[in-house]
Amino acid sequence: MNDLKFTTCGDYVNDQQTIQRIGFACKYMHPDQTQKKKILEEIQRPLNTRSTTVQWLNRQTREVAEQRLWDIMVHNIQAYYNLIEYVGSLPNELRMVRLGSDVLPVYTQRDWSYFWQLPDVRNYCATHFARVGTLARSLDVRLSMHPGQFTVLASDNPDIVDRSIEEFEYHTDVIRYMGYGRQFQDFKCNVHISGRQGPAGIKATLKRLSPEARNTITIENDENKWGIADSLELADDLALVLDVHH
C-alpha cells in the first residue's frame, strides 16, 4: 500500500472482535510514481491541501489576500473530502487517516486570524466541514490530527503555553466543524508531552482547554525527555498514544 504515507496502527472493538487498523498520514501519493510529474500533480492535487504564507499575504492588497485564503479554504475542505472518500474505498483495516494541519492557513496568525471569523467564512466552514465529517462516519474512516512540534502545552513559558493552546483550539475548531468532539475520543488530536513541566504541565493546561479539546486530545510519549512511564502519569486524565519509535 504505497499510495498514502504510512503512519500508525490502532485497535478498535467491532462485533466483539479486536481488529487492527493501519492508517496513513496527510498526503496522497499515487501508487505509480514513475509517471510524469505533471500527470502526478494533476492526479494528486484534488486530494491534497494547499497553503500560503504570511509573507505572501502581507505583500498583497487585502482584497487579493482574502480571495486567496477563500480559494484555499474551498480547495482544502474539498481535498479533505476527496481523501476520506478514497480511504473509505480501501479495506476496513486501512480506513484510518491523519488529516493535515494546514487546512485553514494562518488561522492563529495575529494579522490574518480575523478572516476565519468572518460570517461568510464561518458559514462555509460549518456547512462543508460537516459534509466531511458525515462522509467519514458513513464510511467508518477513523480520523486524527497532530498539531506541530511548536505546540508545547507543558512549557514553562506562559506565552508559549498560550500560543500552544491557541494552536490546539484551532485544530479543535476544525474537529468541531466536522461534528466531532461531542463524545470522549470520537476523534484523536495528538500532541507530545514536550515541555519542561512534563505531565504536571499537561494536567494544568487541560483545565484551560475547551470541552471538545479535552474530549479529543491524546498525549504521546516524547522522543527527547518524557517517555512511556511519564505518559502513564496522565492515564487518569486523558487518552494516551504509544509511539514505539520514540
Predicted regions and their residues:
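Hydrophobic, well-ordered secondary-structure segments
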Residues: 165-172, 202-206
